[in-house]
Structure formats: structure tokens, C-alpha cells
Amino acid sequence: MIAVVDLGIGNLANVRKALGGVITSDPYAIEGAEKIVLPGVGNFGAVMEKLEPLRGVIIDAINDGKPLLGICLGLQLLFEGSEESPGKPGLGVFRGNVVRFQGVRVPHIGWNQVWQRKECPLFEGIKDGAYFYFVHSYYALPEEDVTVGVTDYESKGAKVVFTSAVCRDNVYAVQFHPEKSGRNGLRLLENFRRL
């Protein structure tokens, strides 16, 4: 069973439909799941507050080797903190912080390419430079070698190259929304389901 963590925000139906999972905020269901999906939209601090009662269950699942997929804000929550909510710690699964885009139009909304930097089972059968759908104002700056995909965001004469996918052991996360990314997104979710 795949547990799609319900934090009371965002439309989780498309993620659940693509994965055949169960939408839940029950710690026992999350603990008993074979895989966990941590989706998210909204404010880093507000969502971390809702996630706090599940922190231990999620960290234990990761330490037990269960595959976890973070989506959009779910990727950001896996880092140590965010400029969006100073002083509010993230899950700290990955070292590094989340910063706001500077010099480019915010938010970054629309289709953009993901360039694969390392092999990762999430991207099996997906062409390098494939397009995915993004909606975000912040991005992660990892302080360790976990980046498996990057994206170039150009606007207003400026360019930011940011980490759009990370992977280490059984923890995977993407800044884009695979559930809104057509065939490429469905393939990525299927790859996660088959891990």
C-alpha cells in the first residue's frame, strides 16, 4: 500500500489515482505503508506545523528503508529549513536550505525541462530534457551530493539553474508536479510505484 500523506492542503486525488494509493493522515496507516508520498503546496512553516505530529513516523519509515517521494513543497520539507519560514525547521533528511528565486519572475509557473545529472530509478525511460510542470517560488540548495535533476529558469533577462530532483538511497523528491505533467509525469510516478 502507498500512503499519500494528507496535510489538508492541495488536490491529492490525481497523485492517488496515478499511484493507486490511499490518502491518509493516520500515523498507523503511514507506518504500515510500503511506500510514502509527501505532496505539498502552500507555506513551508504552516505545512511543517501540520506535519509535525507525523515527523517521527516519516523519519522512522525512511530509516527503515521505505521508499518516500516528496512532490513540490514535499521536496522542500525534506531539507533543514526555508527562507519562507525562518526559524521553522524542516525534516532535515537532506542537508541544505530552501531559498526564494531572485532576479526572475516569481512564481515560476509552467512547463520546463529537467536535465538529468545522475542516474535515478525515477527517471527510467524518461528522456533527458523532458518537460514537467512547475509552480513554485522557492527552490532547494542542497549542501550534499543528492541532485539528480536540474532546471534552467530564465525570465526578465536573468537565469537561475536550480535543483529540480533529488535522490539518496530510498528518498526521492521532485520540485515539479508529476501528477500534472502528462505522460512524463505518469511514467515517473509509475517508476516510483514499481520500486
Curated annotation (Swiss-Prot):
The record's annotation in InterPro entries points to: Class_I_gatase-like, GATASE, Imidazole-glycPsynth_HisH
According to its UniProt record, the EC number is 4.3.2.10, 3.5.1.2
A molecular function GO annotation: lyase activity
Signal peptide positions on this chain: none
Q: Which cysteines are joined by disulfide bonds?
A: none
Q: Which GO terms describe its cellular component?
A: cytoplasm
Alphabetical list of CDD domains matching this protein: GATase1_IGP_Synthase (cd01748)
* Active site location: C72 (nucleophile), H177, E179
Q: Which pathway does the record list? A: Amino-acid biosynthesis; L-histidine biosynthesis; L-histidine from 5-phospho-alpha-D-ribose 1-diphosphate: step 5/9
Question: Which NCBIfam families is this protein grouped with?
Answer: IMP_synth_hisH (TIGR01855)
**Keywords, in A-Z order:** Amino-acid biosynthesis, Cytoplasm, Glutamine amidotransferase, Histidine biosynthesis, Hydrolase, Lyase
Q: How does it assemble?
A: Heterodimer of HisH and HisF.
Q: Name one Pfam family in it.
A: GATase
- Please list the reactions this protein catalyses: 5-[(5-phospho-1-deoxy-D-ribulos-1-ylimino)methylamino]-1-(5-phospho-beta-D-ribosyl)imidazole-4-carboxamide + L-glutamine = D-erythro-1-(imidazol-4-yl)glycerol 3-phosphate + 5-amino-1-(5-phospho-beta-D-ribosyl)imidazole-4-carboxamide + L-glutamate + H(+); L-glutamine + H2O = L-glutamate + NH4(+)
Q: Where in this chain does the record put each Glutamine amidotransferase type-1 domain?
A: 1-195
- Protein's name in the database: Imidazole glycerol phosphate synthase subunit HisH
Q: What does this protein do?
A: IGPS catalyzes the conversion of PRFAR and glutamine to IGP, AICAR and glutamate. The HisH subunit catalyzes the hydrolysis of glutamine to glutamate and ammonia as part of the synthesis of IGP and AICAR. The resulting ammonia molecule is channeled to the active site of HisF.
Where it sits in the cell: the answer is: Cytoplasm
GO BP terms in the entry: L-histidine biosynthetic process
